[in-house]
Amino acid sequence: MSAQDNLTINEKKVLLALEELGSAAPDKLEEKSGLQVDAAMQAAFMLQEKGLASVSEKVLERYSLTKEGEEYTKTGLPERQIIDALKAPAPLEELRSRFSPKTVGIATGWLIKKGWAKVENGVMVPSGNAPAGRDEEVLAAFAGKAKTLEELAADEGTVKELLKRKLVIKHEEKSRTVSVTGAGSALAAEGIVLEEEIAQLTPELLKSGAWKGKKFRPYRLDIAPNPLYGVKIHPYRRLIEQMRQIFLEMGFTEIKGGIIQSSFWNFDALFQPQDHPARDMQDTFHLGSICQLPAEYSDKVAAMHESGGDIDSCGWGGIWDRELARRNVLRTHTTSVTIKYLADNPEPPVKAFCIDRAYRRETIDPTHTPEFEQLEGVVMDKDMSFADLLGLLAEFYHRMGFEEVRFRPGYFPYTEPSVEPEVYVDGLGWVELGGAGVFRKEVTEPFGIKEPVLAWGLGVSRLAMLKLGLKDLRLLYQSDIDWLRKSEVCRI
């Protein structure tokens, strides 16, 4: 395809006009090309993209008088009105009776600033020297028209002062000039043929046969079209849904619970000591309300904390504080939801999971936020073992696309044994994604649970960062439209 074939009929007309004019303003280009000014400028911009023309833009600043400024060209500035009438010292009260209070108020400051007069004990005393100022000369130079600094023969400081006094206003006028480039002149010299082209074959053209013998505008297939961004689910929401589906397919029941939990269910029921650092104000959102303790469980949990209850345990010792257990908090983990579910369903089998938000007092940075999602789950049945827990978690991570999974020993107050699952990520190595273990008898015994309970709490947002290739956790919660548009729906 020749360079000329790549031009529309309007572009050809504008290029021919520019070849003759060299450069032109939009109105001259309109006149020479025979096109409307909008069509001519659209063609000029297209020629600029192709390197055949250039469009330069100049911003011209003009100034015009405000209504107040126009009034002062007739009456004189307030300070001029006062000084011309002031033949001898006069009290300010007398001036206010002769002129409007507004005029006297404005004039007083300017008379002193310009050195035309001074005020002594409430009396205006003229200095006897009040030559015409540049501001007065500039106001007179407008003559009722908008003008540039050059046309006013004014310095920028004087005009800036008049702007502050709101006697003039500034207008910005944009002017464009279109010029032909060397490449444009060379193409025009080859001879440009003006021939109407059909850009789109319509049903009317087909029916009438008017397309016969006409030239069709060629299409360039090497130009990428504008990207089309379809509607799609937020990447983070899509990953959460993927996790849900995995556990539902594995036969689990999804459970939910309130974000406000008592300290009893959030901490004490999980055999977390009442002096544990996680319960401090700097780690937990404590609320100003309290609740009633569950009568059927509170005494058993108290006994377990104080002395180990009826099992082979010594508990934490000391006196269990019931008032502390009654205090409401924003749940720091969703384990409070699963332990309540187990208390309501103490007989096997139980397979339940929860994906929901938890809250902790965290400083916001690329890897921490005070709100985050957690994937919690439990399995309670006869003959369940620690090996079953490892196999279940490995299966989950494999289904999420991680080929290598390993487990490291861990410690949590309410599970024994405990592990931390890790996955291998190219470029990062092994990454820890949560905690898991078998609930201790100190947790299950007060609720009448006799069978082993496998439990885990996995970090959802950290897993999402790995899957989405993010280094900043905050992007998951921000409305970055560009990132959302370009995020992958799936990887084939």
Swiss-Prot record:
Needed co-factor(s): Mg(2+)
Gene Ontology molecular function, alphabetical: ATP binding; magnesium ion binding; phenylalanine-tRNA ligase activity; tRNA binding
One GO BP annotation of this record: phenylalanyl-tRNA aminoacylation
InterPro entries: aa-tRNA-synth_II, aa-tRNA-synth_II/BPL/LPL, Phe-tRNA-synth_IIc_asu, Phe_tRNA_ligase_alpha_bac/arc, Phenylalanyl-tRNA_Synthase
UniProt keyword terms in alphabetical order: Aminoacyl-tRNA synthetase, ATP-binding, Cytoplasm, Ligase, Magnesium, Metal-binding, Nucleotide-binding, Protein biosynthesis
Designated name of the protein: Phenylalanine--tRNA ligase alpha subunit
Catalytic activity: tRNA(Phe) + L-phenylalanine + ATP = L-phenylalanyl-tRNA(Phe) + AMP + diphosphate + H(+)
Record localization: Cytoplasm
Keyword match Electron transport: no
EC number: 6.1.1.20
Subunit-structure text: Tetramer of two alpha and two beta subunits.
EC category name: ligase
Cofactor note: Binds 2 magnesium ions per tetramer.
Organism encoding this protein: Methanosarcina acetivorans (strain ATCC 35395 / DSM 2834 / JCM 12185 / C2A)
Residues annotated for Mg(2+) binding in this entry: 416
Similarity-based family: Belongs to the class-II aminoacyl-tRNA synthetase family. Phe-tRNA synthetase alpha subunit type 2 subfamily.
Binding residue positions for L-phenylalanine: 335, 374-376, 414, 439
